[in-house]
């Protein structure tokens, strides 16, 4: 039996990447994917809502990612068509966002 090779640093002698780096890269990919399918103003409004609610915290980032994943899943289930959701022709794109309960 041979032993498993020991892990060594990359050839350029940079330190190995942290597991969190992969999470950040995956998150950026999801945001880029959301930008392909949703109006950027809608995503900015969502980001502002999450920021107002959670501030600049990891919990807020997780909440934003969770909402984006759900929205993309529903969007793809409904049949994508690569249109930008929330961007009605000639109207305010933010009017497509339902008013939250308790804010009426």
Swiss-Prot record:
Q: Which UniProt keywords apply?
A: Activator, AIDS, Cell cycle, Host G2/M cell cycle arrest by virus, Host nucleus, Host-virus interaction, Modulation of host cell cycle by virus, Phosphoprotein, Transcription, Transcription regulation, Viral penetration into host nucleus, Virion, Virus entry into host cell
Mainly localized where? virion
Q: Where is the composition biased (Basic and acidic residues)?
A: 10-20
Does the keyword field hold Phosphoprotein? Answer: yes
Give the UniProt entry's GO cellular component terms. host cell; host cell nucleus; virion component
Give the source's domain of life in one word: Viruses
Residue runs in coiled coils? none
Q: Which Gene Ontology terms describe the biological processes this protein takes part in?
A: symbiont entry into host cell; symbiont-mediated arrest of host cell cycle during G2/M transition; viral penetration into host nucleus
Annotated region described as Disordered, given as residue ranges: 1-21, 84-104
Residue numbers bearing the Phosphoserine modification: 83
Where does it live in the cell? Answer: Virion; Host nucleus
Which Pfam families does this one have? VPR
Any idea what job this protein has? Stimulates gene expression driven by the HIV-2 LTR. Prevents infected cells from undergoing mitosis and proliferating, by inducing arrest or delay in the G2 phase of the cell cycle. Cell cycle arrest creates a favorable environment for maximizing viral expression and production.
Instruction: State whether it acts alone or in a complex, and with which partners, per the record.
Output: Interacts with human UNG.
Q: State the protein's name.
A: Protein Vpr
Taxonomy of origin reads: Viruses, Riboviria, Pararnavirae, Artverviricota, Revtraviricetes
- Gene encoding this chain? vpr
């Amino acid at each position: 039996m041979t032993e498993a090779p020991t892990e060594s640093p990359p050839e350029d002698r940079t330190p190995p990447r942290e597991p969190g780096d992969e999470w950040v890269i995956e998150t950026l990919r999801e945001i880029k994917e959301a930008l392909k399918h949703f109006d950027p103003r809608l995503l900015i409004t969502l980001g502002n809502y999450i920021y107002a609610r959670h501030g600049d915290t990891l919990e807020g980032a997780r909440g934003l990612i969770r909402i984006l994943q759900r929205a993309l899943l529903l969007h793809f289930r409904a049949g994508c068509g690569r249109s930008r959701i929330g961007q009605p022709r000639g109207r305010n794109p933010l009017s497509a966002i339902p008013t939250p309960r308790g804010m009426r």
